[in-house]
Structures are given as structure tokens and as C-alpha cells.
Amino acid sequence: MGCTVSLVCCEALEPLPSCGPQPPGTPPGPARPERCEPGGAAPDPRRRLLLQPEDLEAPKTHHFKVKAFKKVKPCGICRQAITREGCVCKVCSFSCHRKCQAKVAAPCVPPSSHELVPITTETVPKNVVDVGEGDCRVGSSPKNLEEGGSMRVSPSIQPQPQSQPTSLSRNTSVSRAMEDSCELDLVYVTERIIAVSFPSTANEENFRSNLREVAQMLKSKHGGNYLLFNLSEQRPDITKLHAKVLEFGWPDLHTPALEKICSVCKAMDTWLNADPHNVVVLHNKGNRGRIGVVIAAYLHYSNISASADQALDRFAMKRFYEDKIVPIGQPSQRRYVHYFSGLLSGSIKMNNKPLFLHHVIMHGIPNFESKGGCRPFLRIYQAMQPVYTSGIYNIPGDSQASICITIEPGLLLKGDILLKCYHKKFRSPARDVIFRVQFHTCAIHDLGVVFGKEDLDEAFKDDRFPDYGKVEFVFSYGPEKIQGMEHLENGPSVSVDYNTSDPLIRWDSYDNFSGHREDGMEEVVGHTQGPLDGSLYAKVKKKDSLNGSSGPVTTARPALSATPNHVEHTLSVSSDSGNSTASTKTDKTDEPVSGATTAPAALSPQEKKELDRLLSGFGVDREKQGAMYRAQQLRSHPGGGPTVPSPGRHIVPAQVHVNGGALASERETDILDDELPIQDGQSGGSMGTLSSLDGVTNTSESGYPETLSPLTNGLDKPYSTEPVLNGGGYPYEAANRVIPVHSSHSAPIRPSYSAQEGLAGYQREGPHPAWSQQVTSAHCGCDPSGLFRSQSFPDVEPQLPQAPTRGGSSREAVQRGLNSWQQQQPHPPPRQQERSPLQSLARSKPSPQLSAETPVAALPEFPRAASQQEIEQSIETLNMLMLDLEPASAAAPLHKSQSVPGAWPGASPLSSQPLLGSSRQSHPLTQSRSGYIPSGHSLGTPELVSSGRPYSPYDYQLHPAGSNQSFHPKSPASSTFLPSPHSSAGPQEPPASLPGLIAQPQLPPKETTSDPSRTPEEEPLNLEGLVAHRVAGVQARERQPAEPPGPLRRRAASDGQYENQSPEATSPRSPGVRSPVQCVSPELALTIALNPGGRPKEPHLHSYKEAFEEMEGTSPSSPPHSVARSPPGLAKTPLSALGLKPHNPADILLHPTGVARRLIQPEEDEGEEVTKPPEEPRSYVESVARTAVAGPRAQDVEPKSFSAPAAHAYGHETPLRNGTPGGSFVSPSPLSTSSPILSADSTSVGSFPSVVSSDQGPRTPFQPMLDSSIRSGSLGQPSPAALSYQSSSPVPVGGSSYNSPDYSLQPFSSSPESQGQPQYSAASVHMVPGSPQARHRTVGTNTPPSPGFGRRAVNPTMAAPGSPSLSHRQVMGPSGPGFHGNVVSGHPASAATTPGSPSLGRHPVGSHQVPGLHSSVVTTPGSPSLGRHPGAHQGNLASSLHSNAVISPGSPSLGRHLGGSGSVVPGSPSLDRHAAYGGYSTPEDRRPTLSRQSSASGYQAPSTPSFPVSPAYYPGLSSPATSPSPDSAAFRQGSPTPALPEKRRMSVGDRAGSLPNYATINGKVSSSPVANGMASGSSTVSFSHTLPDFSKYSMPDNSPETRAKVKFVQDTSKYWYKPEISREQAIALLKDQEPGAFIIRDSHSFRGAYGLAMKVSSPPPTITQQGKKGDMTHELVRHFLIETGPRGVKLKGCPNEPNFGSLSALVYQHSVIPLALPCKLVIPSRDPTDESKDSSGPANSTTDLLKQGAACNVLFVNSVDMESLTGPQAISKATSETLAADPTPAATIVHFKVSAQGITLTDNQRKLFFRRHYPLNTVTFCDLDPQERKWMKTEGGAPAKLFGFVARKQGSTTDNACHLFAELDPNQPASAIVNFVSKVMLSAGQKR
């Protein structure tokens, strides 16, 4: 077996035979000569092993000589600095003072051969062809460089970190000796856990031989009962040799993402518990620290449910870890094990707040230069994506005691963070690693964090780093500069070089980790199997001279000049800003299984079935089976040639999956621009490089590249080959391009799948029908994950079965129904799109250079960086995972990883959030859980839509990967914005044909009609998993923009301690939060932020916080949420997406609107684009942009209106609809003709690939904007609208009415002036009506899209009617101040959702307005939900801004948080849940604390009305403005009031939900929020007055034609989807209905989930047994939770319930078969709210009000025991005691709800409690403080009245407690609350 020695045999205590200890039954391995001694032949191994340590440690005398030290060095004895003369050992270099020489006791240990070379030196290979972050292509450098640093000098020796530089401990020496001498080390850690480890320097031939022997041994001993976990880079030979392999690799010497640790443990536990004979094999090549991390983590994991019979196993694991791993492990690995242990045990609480890194202070200057000092620079990675690169600091020796690297504005960090500090050698193309540190923000609870030398990887064993040295990180909760930190400035001797264009600085090797190593297999095909990427010829791979790995040679893309474009590069001044160094993720090409390939026979059907059952809980998608499947397939076709030409490759972001291992990994790095694939031969250096693209590597949640193996191939030398290859052996050049790496047979693999998924994949994958679906080749599928895969695949893309991939159980449950369709479908579309489409769109904002490597087809898929959302999601997921990890929590032992962790109420704030948002969602929660789930997963599998696939609720179809989802827009308009960046190959990428449209591929071949239905992954909703939602909610709360940036900290001492000071009032986050990248201007940042693509994988995850933030304007005191949200990933948004034109700064037009996708303005404004004057540039980039803007702006851009370019792209002159000058269409702008935009005449949308091409033709001043908008907004990702909806009818582009004038909305401002002015039409995205394909996967073509799916569409775009849901990010406008509104220059931007669009997106980001701008959001009728959180960032903007959101009638919910003042057009059932309109129109906006609180808490209180302000209101309790019923008059035609706007988390009673708003005074409604559609109770803003005269515009709902076209045959969602109503309202509506009547609403307890309330014929037995008395009609209304996950939606807690692609699908299925419900659902034919209104009297009767209750936020001050005292005396006494207390108690914001049931307090932030309920019969008194004392400790310092209520203590009849509160919202005074409580109490007393 090649394994002759086990580490255990090194123990002196256990002299064992040469083969090491073998567990009982272990077959003797084949006899092989001992390798333990490098040269040796082999005396008795036992003796040699025992003696070796002694030999190594034999004491030897030092040979000291006196030396004058020029640079400071610490004394090895006293640790003090040696300043002048000292002694140094000539042998071991041990240094000490002369006086300390006598005290030296440590033996002299000469350095090993591997220590002769500096361990951390990295050099850039000489022949660097491409200058790029990770793109350094090596010509012939003989050295392999490792990011980790060591230079391997001897092939047989692997340097291992030493815990002590001078003396080796026994364990260390033994371990090193073993590692140096043994090729293979196989150890049975326990009887069922085997560790197989090879040194990274193992000879390749021997390594392969040993691999085979290990495989033989495992098969002979364990048969098929072993599962191999590959912890290092992927190798084809591993998957060929073993039937079951899960890829969990990560870079050597690094630590895996926390989520990956969770996934590994879950997978191990599931496998081991499935069968007592199952064993786990941990395979690792490189440092054994990786095995140690897994063993230690599993030790803690299994300890949770520890049992006595496992005690020995745990002891064995502990001993193995301590003896074999600790000596060689890295500090960060130990830190992560500690994190994992703490999170499991609860000792570490999850911190979901966003942390902004402002300063990195290095105390103690390392001596890396001969004269002392060093030249450090930092690179910061988030989820292994570079997000920041600092300048190079030149620090002379002895000049400084510390150095501070300042990042301004603060860099937003979230999730797994890796910070590497390098030393750039002087005049040498090399860099040394000074230190490396990894941490996870969830475990950071202090704003000052210090890591000592022993905590720093690399430095802990480096003498050059002073022993007293430490590194301090200074964080804050906002990007604004921290006050009081001026003393941190460096001295004059420190200079900074910002020339980050040097390839050495930008070089990043992590991109390649996920690639396959090709050196492991002989069966490598030398060419691709046909022109898979759209090129005419197959690409021949030629051996790379350097390492022999082959890589396709591509001439399609000119080599970039070695000299970077400085304009672009300088952008990265002190940050990666993603523009400069963010590297896009490596695209993985997922190769579909060849169409005809037969399923590998590796596993029998029974085995597969069993495995599937076991692993189903993991959420392993079939797509994910990739690796395993691949292995099997490889086995079937060893030659690697597919039996059938491989259908097409899916580019899986971040990882190249090559089944045959035929290709080295390729990666597309967005490093600056070098790596951009060049479009049409244009140089890729433009600013809009991919790097900016959101699409940085998709990192799976785990934070590593998403692919199966999260990191680069070669990680075994994580970096060793950095410079040389992409890890995959491709020269970087090739790597840049997305090269379709096809190995002949690659199973479609999701880039990274969770282990579970992988497991599940095994069986699932099995016998799929040949997947040969046609896909439009070269589509840039915009997968929800936001990656645009440039898919140049053959026409056929394999599709994975579309089963409701839920777990085995759910699948089985639905199997009946599914079988038929599954059989019908050639292959179910992979659920590639874990991310919500929007996300994907945003994410994939293609850079202008989207062009694929080949001009034609392969659009580079834009790798996405982990978007902020994704990262947040990943954190949320992590949180959920931690909760879910507890073995007990799993519903079934085997399904611990069940897709959605239960959303049990008490779980944790996180638990209430749905899984990570869309972004990861594409994969089942589990996936996310697994940590692998790459956001790009979805990408991994092509989103193929079988062209003929029938709609099926279960049919989770992704858009064809190739098809541009965004293109799918049916309407030109949408396409216009949507040109998908990826479709760089433009012509070839015809959008998948729209449902109604026949796609006219601009390029002939490869066009495929994509089925309108999307895979669930695509749905934003689906994408959002419960966990994500729960987590997000929590995060959202925590990171509410309104929340003050955080107390300012003054550093009290240098140790990094800070004193908290009260935050300055209103220190808004920088309006445009630039992405952490400094270079980006606020506008850019906003754009980026809005632009999901800008974020690293921000899919839908969209953490709730973000969603909230988006929804709620951030308060002035807090930075705009957009800012907060903008993840570092922003840096990754392609500049082009921002509208920056590559190469020519002058051309760069910064699109202030930030929403790259401008909404198409109503027709009148169609041709015009509005621009807004930019703020003062904050960075070079911004200034450049500004400059560019200035020029163009000055000019009359009218002609270049956005729409024009679109039109031009086709060369058609589009008629302007409202008299917009035809001239507006200019010559083809960057939108290339190939862009898929619909031509005026044609119904099909052409591919938009080149739309963005920056070089294509002169840009008109506006064009850049257009491009940017397109790019960022919809380009790469078809505009959400467009994408989301493949509508059957085209939408006018830019408002131009192409073929469907009816759909285009009339521009809001038809005024000539607007036309005359250069307005960028905000590219309103019209959702084409009736496009079922919208992101929601709907049940059938005719079924209405599920209302809630596009939960987060950004509101700036208009959704065309019928578009089920706008992808969440797609529609987003820029979020954050500065980009408000799509309109710039004061022109209103209109965002309209056309009728019928069930849901625009959950959080349409409201149009953010800049002061003075008007943005109007119009949702057309029938759109059930515009978006949950249209970012209402404008809340922060000056109040002068007005954003008009008009929801047209019938739109059930505009967006949960429509931003901007929005008028709800009558009929719209619900305006955005948290629309924040106007300046700080809502209390939350005004009070940061409120919004913070609300957003911070994941709990969204039910939308109960606020308290009536004046008693006058009580008599009738009827206020014209308030209407409990969703369809109250407010929604009737003509009524400006919105229907049931979603409450804004109850904060401040601004729930403008359907509940009455009591903010009215004396019954007089003054623009009550309800009336206004504002979420706030304030009556200051009336939407109507901000809207232009609507009579001038043709509102979509006013057009009969439009209305007619918008109708869905079965769209009844408006009757049963009432997102805003509360549980009580649902009961009131249903209690008198027939059994089967139901309503679905948005859950207030579990963010992102839905509540199903249905009437049943009889109450459950438990109710009758309890003998409850009273009105039983309420008990007949039962409530079910519908959770959302990557696979869609499903009833929670029902194992036999499948996942559905949309709410509509779930509803219609249950109307046919009840499944787990008590009875079938009865689809309503009319709105129940109408019926209730008909039958009930006045809408706001006193009874209704009391029944409904009222609520608002107040400050909870204290609870004081009163014994039996009550009445005013109790209130007075409690107040006196509280005010006299020392210290005075801190007040906490709580949600105070009063109803007929009693008083309920909810601590949204869960600081004191979760929820407390005081039944009405226990409340004895409520009143204000009789002495009218005030509470002074309020946020703003204004005194607040105190009030309280007295209630009996639980379980007592005499003892009382008085609960004191202070009013928080001026609109909800204490008197109103007290009056209402008294009224309720009085009413209850009368009843009794």
C-alpha cells in the first residue's frame, strides 16, 4: 500500500512494526521498502524511529562569535533588543547579549536543508506575460512559489512550521522527521476515521503509485463503505480511484472557512451514522494541519452529543491532534477550531454586525531588509477574494516603533477574512510574507483586536518578526473616519508607494486553488472536445514548458501588455477596490456530462439510492455531485473522451471542473483589468475590468472559491506555483480567460457543493438521462448567483434532474408527481442558481469587456466575488449551521444537514432568518450550510432550460446558463439594460428565447429557447434560504443603517483599547459608501452596492439587514445602508458596470444613479437619460469618472439616451414614443450590435454581450452611463426585469416602444424640459407583462409567478407586468445616498413595475435620490410584490428629496422596502414593506436607533398600527387613513393610499401596513403613512404632492391594452398573497370562510419566510383535548410556516413536503393534493378583503381596532417589584427607584404591542429578552408618571416622558411588578399609548 509508517509509530511509547499500528483486521499492506529514512535502507524501523528524535535533539554546543548588529534583533534569552554588540552562533544563528551567553541552555540545532532558504520568500516568475493580480503568467521560472511562502528546495522535504525558531520540541522533530522522510502516512485516528497524508513535496510518480495502493487497501478492507474527503486540491486521479469523494480542499497552511468546517463535520457525522461499517478517509497532500483542523472540529462536534461508547474515539482524536498536529499547525487553524468549538458550545456569540476596518497597526517593525526595517504592504481577502491592497510602506530600520496602515474609508469586512502582509524586496521581483492571519468577523466582538506574534501565521516562527511584535486591527461599525485616531499617523520617515500596478503586488494565487491538477492522470486529452466555447476550432492544449501541465492555447485574446494601464491601476491606490486587485473568481467550467454518456457504473442503483437518501439532507444537488459523478464518469471513460461530444461546458465560477483532469485550472481574474477577457480584441486593461465585476470568484459560503474544491488546484503548494500557474497549470494568460475547460466528460458540477450535496449527488447523479439539452451556446447565463457564466457550451448543456431537490425525503414525497415530469425532461435544469437572479445579475455585472475570450462566444463568465450579501449570508448560514449542527437539532439523525435548519422560534435571531439569501441559495440550504455553496453554484450547472421543457412547479429551471437571464427579458427595454455582459460574444448569445418571443439569435447556432420557468435557484426567493433569511434578519437588524456608526472610540492606550464615546450625532455613513475600496467614489460605491454584482456574491442573500437597510432609509446618523452594505466586494464591481469606460478616463461617465440599470423612463422620457452632478470626487477613480462625466455632461447627451444606444445596437432607429427626439438614438454605442437588445422590429432579444464592450465605437457622453447602467444594472445581468421576465412581448428599450408600446410606461415627466435635458432614462426595466419566466419559477407557463419571489428587486426598475418577480438585485437602483433615484439632474426617475408582475423583487432598492431628485417607482397593477426592500435609502438623503413610488393597482406588494417617497397607486395591495420615503420621513429615518433597532432585529413585528395619537381618535376609532383590511379604500382606484404597505419592522409604529395608523391627530389623518404608502407614521410627507401630474402620464394600469396583456390565466395571487397583513388579520379574514380558504402573508417572526393561514373544518385534536373555552372559530384557522431555501419554498416541519419553485406552485399543487395540509387549498376567485369589507361595517371600528391592536417602539427602562402595590403610586415608586439607581439602568428599544390579548414586549435586539407577554387579565394599571418626570438618557438627549404599567407576576395572585418605559417616537407619545391600553382594558372589563 505504499504506506509503511504511521505517525503513531513515532511514539516512543509504542514501538510498532514498520507498517505502523494497524487496527484489528487491517490487511497488511504490500511490502515496500521503508521510506522513513531519506536515503536509507532500513535497519529495524522500530529502533530507527525511536532513536531519530534523540538524534535530532542531541545537545550540541553553540559556536558563538561576537558581532555588531546593524539591525535590531531580540536576544534569545532575555528577549530584549540587541542594540550594539551581541553573540551569534555560527551554526544555528542563535543571537543573544554577551551577558546572556552563559544562560543559553537550548541546544544548537543546525538548520535543515529546507531552512537554508527564507521560508517565506516569493518571487514573481521571470517571464510575466500578463500583469494581473493572479494572472502572472510564468514563462520559465524554475521556482515554484507558494503564497504561503516556502520555496521548496528539496523535493523530499516539506518545511513545516516550527513552533519555536530555535529549539524543536520532541513532537515537532518527530513529526518533521516523519514528514520529511515518508512519502505516505496512513493512520487510523479511530477505527472509523483514517487520515492519509502525503508531503507536498512527494514525488509525483510515487504519489500516484501510493494513491493506487491506498485505494486498493481501502477497497479490500472496507469495500464500498468508505467516503474519502479530499482536503487538498482536486485531482482527477483521486476521483477515479475512489467511488465516493467529497471535495473540501482549501489552501495548504491556511484554515478553511467556518462554513466548510461545519459542512465537513456534518458530512462526516451523517456518513458515519448511516452505517456502522462506514468509515471516513481524510486525504491530504501537504501540511497535516488540514487534517488536524477536521479532526479537532469533528472532535468538538461529536462531543455535543457525546456518549460513553464514543469516549475512546474522542480520546484518540484528541491525542492525534495534540501529538501530531499541534506542533505543525498554524495559529489561524487553531483559532478556527476555537471559533468552531465556541460557536457550538455557545461560548462565542455570533456577531453579525458589519465591521469596517480602518487601521492595521504593526507594533514592532520586522527586519526584512539588510539594514533593518521592511517594505510592507497588505492584501486583504474576504472569502478568499482580494478586496484590498495597500500601498507599499517604506519603513527604515530603527525609525519607528510601529507602523499604521490606514484604510479610508473603512473597509467593510464580513465573514472569513484573510489578511496577508508582505515585504516587497528592494530592487528584487520577490516578496516575503511577513505574517498572515485569518479570522471570522462573527467571532470579533471588540472594535480593537490584537494578535501577538504567536497568533500570526508565518511570523510565529520567523526570527525576523520581533517577539514582542503584535498586530492590531482597529474596526468600527461605519466607514467614516474614526475621530480621535490622529495620533496613529506615521512619522515623516515612512513613505508610501501607491504603485500597485506592479504585478508582484497584485499577484494573487488563491484564484487557482479550485482548478484540477492535471499531473495526476495519464488520460489527458490534448484538445477540447469540439468547439464548445463558440470558437470554430477545438483548442489544442500544449504542454506548458514549465510544469508540463497542459492548457488550451488560445489566440483569441491578445496578450495584455506587460505594462498595466496606470490609469486603471492607480485606481487601487490604497485599496483593491476590487477594481484593482479584486480577482474575479476563477470560472470553473462545469462540464456537463456528455449527452450520451451512460451513468457510471461505480455505484449500483441501490447504492446510489441509499446514498442519496443518506445525503439528501445535505442538500447536495445533483449538479453538485460533480466530483463524485465525475469520478464515476471518468472511470467509465478513462480515456477522458466523452462518448458523445460534451454538450457544453458550464463555467462554474471559481473552479474549473475538468473531469478528465484534462485541463489545468483556468481562472478569470478580474485583477485590474488585465484579466478581463478581451472583447473583440479590445484590451482588457480597462477600468471596467472583471475585477470590478461583482463576479469575483465565487466563493462559496465557505469563503473559498466556490468550486468543489474551494481553492486552487495546486494548493498543495498553495502558492508555490502561484506565479507560475493558475494552480491548474495553465499559464496565467489562459487563466484569465474563461476557457471552457472541457474535459471530455465532466459531470455538471456545482462549483462547490456542500459535502452533503456531494454525497447526495452520488446516488442522485446516477442514471440521469443523457443530459443533452440545448442551451444557447455562449449564453451568458446570468445565474442567480450572479455569475455570468460565459457559457460557450455546445448547444447542449447537461441539465441535472430538476427534482425538487430537497432531501431524499421530500423528493420521495413528491416523487409521484415528479416522476412523470422528470422523465419528460431530458435533464432537470441544474439548480445552479443558488443566487437569486438579481443577485446574479448584480453580481455578474459584466465589465464592458465582457467579451469572452473568443470574440464570439465564450462570454467570460464573470466570476463573482463573494458579494457582501453572500458573505453575510454565509455568516448567517454559518449561524444557522451552528444551530443546525447540533446533532439533536436535526429532525432525523441522517438529515442533520437538512436543507433548512429549522426556523425554530427560539433558535436565535439568526434562526429566524431564512438561509442565506439567494446568493447561496441556489444550493439547498444545506449547501450553504456546507459552506461550499458557491454562490455561483448555480452557475456550476448550466442553467439549461430545456427548450421544450414544460413548466412544472418542480421544474427548477435555471435560465440556460448561457442564456442571459437578464436577456430573457422579453422586452427590448429590459434587454436593453440587460445586455448581459457576458454575452460578450454577443452575437452568439441570443437570449434564450423569451417565452413569447422567438429568440432571434444574433448568432446563429446555439440558440436555445429557454424555458420561461426558472429553476428555483433562480428565484430570488428561493435563493434565499431560511437560514439566510433568519441570519440576514438578524444581521439586518444589527447592521441597520440607522444605527449610529458606533461609539467613537478614543484609543486610551496603545494597546488598542478604546474608550467608547457617544457617537456623534448624525455621523452619516459616508453617503456613498464607497465600497471599502477607497478609490471608488460614493456614487460608484452606491452603484456597486446596489449593484449586487459589485458585491462579492451578494446574491439574494441580501442579508436582512441589508434588506432592511435598503428598505429603510438610513438615518442621518448612520451611513446609508447601502454603504454599509456595500461589501468590499464593491471593489469588485466592474468599473464598466459603473459606467466607466475602460481605457479612457475621459469617457468614463460616472452614473450617479448608481443603478446601472436605469429604469426605462416612461415613454415620454424615453430617450433621455438623466444625470446627476456627482459629489466631490473622493478618489482618483471618482475624480476620473467625474472628469469624464463633466465633459459628457456638459454636452447635450440627449441623443445618446440610454434607449438610443440600445436601439442602435440593433441598428434600428427606434421611434421615440412621446415625441422624444429620434435623434436620441445615437450610432451604435457601446451596446454592440451583438447585444441582444430587441431590435425595434424583432421580438427576440439579441445577446447583449457587447453592449458593454468599451471599445466598441465612440461613446456618447451618455453612453458610458448607459453602459454602466447596463452593465452594472442589467448588462451582465439582464436587467432584473428583463431577466426575470422573459416576457412574451418585448419591452421598449429605454422607453422606446419597440414593439410593445403598450408596455412601456409613459415617462413620469413628460415635460419638455426633461426631454430636452440629458437624462439617462433610468432604464426602467419594464417587466414584460406575462413573462412567467420571471425569476419566480412558476408552476406553469400560465401560472402567475409567485408573488413573493423577487423579494428584493431594486425598485428603480420598472417591472413589466406579469413578470413574476424581478430579481432582487437586478432591479436595484443604486443604494445609498448619492445614487438616489435613477434620476440625476433632478429628473425624476421612475421605476415602474408593470402589471402582473407578482413580485418585482424583494428589496427593490428604492431609487435613491440625491437631494432634489425625484424618483418615482411605479408598480403596475397585478404585481403582487415589487420587492420587499426596494432600497429606501433615500431616507437618509436630504428631506428635500422626493421619490415617488407609485404602485399601480393590483400590485400586491410593491416592494417590501420601496425606497423613495412612493405613492401607492390605488389597487396596489401592498406597498413596499418598508418604503422609506422622502427625507427622513419616517421616524426610523429620523432616529437611527429606531431603524437600527428594527433592522438589527431579525424579528419583524407584525404590522400592527401605531397608537392613535389622540383620544379623539378613540371614539370612532375610525380614521379615514387607516384601514385594517388590505384592500381598504386606500387601495381602491383613485385612492392615493397604498394597500398594506409592509410594515417597517414595527419600528416606531411606522408600520404603514394595512393596520390603521394611529399617528393621526384627533382622528384627522394627515398623510398617514398608510395613506402615503409611507412606512412611517409621520404625517410629514404626502406622496401625492411629490408626484408629477399623473394625468400627463399613462400609468400602466390605466391602459386597457396593458392591463389585458398583463393578465395571467391563473394569476390569483393577488387574492391569496397578502404580504403585509398580520396573523390576527388573517384569522379575521378566514374565520368565516369555507374550509380550504387560505391566505399567504410574509412571516413576521421568520424573516424571509411566509405564513400560510388556512381555514379547516375542525380544530386539531390537541385543541379539543385542552378543552379551550370561548370562540373556537379562531382555532379553525391554522397556521403553517412556509420556509424559503435554495430550492424554493416548502412547508416547514413536513418531511413529506417537496420544495416548490414558487409560492404559486406550492399553492396550486396543494389545491390538487393536500399533501401535508389538513385539506386541499381552495383557490379564491375574489379578494377576501373585499368580502370582509362588504360584510363588516366601518373599517376602523373600535372593535376592530381593539381586536387588531396597536404597536410602536418604546424605550424599556426598568422593571421594579411592587409586591402588592398598584395604581399611580406604583408607577411613581418605580420611577423614583429607577432614577435614583446608580448606575441608572440603560434603556433598550422594545416593540410594545397592545391588543385584546394583552401587552406584548419584543426586544428586537434581544439584549434583555426575546419576547414577554402580559395577558390582559394580569395588567392592573397603566399610566404616565404622576410627577411627570422625564427620561433624559435618550439618543438625541431630548427628555422623554415616562409611563408604565403594573402587572401581576406570573404564578402569583398578589405580587406585582411595574414596568417602566419612555416614549421613543414623537409621533407615538406616551399619552397615546396609555390611552389605548386603558381603552383596551376597559373594553375587556366590559366583556367580562
Swiss-Prot record:
Residues 1616-1725 form the SH2 domain. Residues 21-31 have a biased composition (Pro residues). Residues 352-478 form the C2 tensin-type domain. Residues 21-45, 132-174, 543-608, 696-722, 789-854, 893-1077, 1109-1555 are annotated as: Disordered. Disruption phenotype: Reduced RHOA activity, reduced endothelial cell proliferation and migration, reduced endothelial cell tube formation and reduced angiogenesis. Residues 571-584, 835-852, 962-986, 1057-1069, 1240-1257, 1301-1322, 1436-1446, 1490-1507 have a biased composition (Polar residues). The modification Phosphothreonine is found at residues 1015, 1343, 1420. Disulfide bonds: none annotated. GO terms for cellular component: cell surface; cell-substrate junction; cytoplasm; cytoskeleton; focal adhesion. Its main location: other. The modification Phosphoserine is found at residues 509, 535, 549, 604, 792, 867, 930, 935, 952, 1054, 1062, 1118, 1122, 1279, 1331, 1346, 1423, 1448, 1463, 1468, 1535, 1547, 1554, 1599, 1741. InterPro entries: C1-like_sf, C2_domain_sf, PE/DAG-bd, PH-like_dom_sf, Prot-tyrosine_phosphatase-like, PTB, PTB/PI_dom, SH2. SMART domains: PTB (SM00462), PTEN_C2 (SM01326), PTPc_motif (SM00404), SH2 (SM00252). Residues 175-347 form the Phosphatase tensin-type domain. It is found in: Cell surface; Cell junction, Focal adhesion; Cytoplasm, Cytoskeleton. A zinc finger (Phorbol-ester/DAG-type) spans 61-108. Belongs to the PTEN phosphatase protein family. This is Tensin-1. It comes from Mus musculus (Mouse).
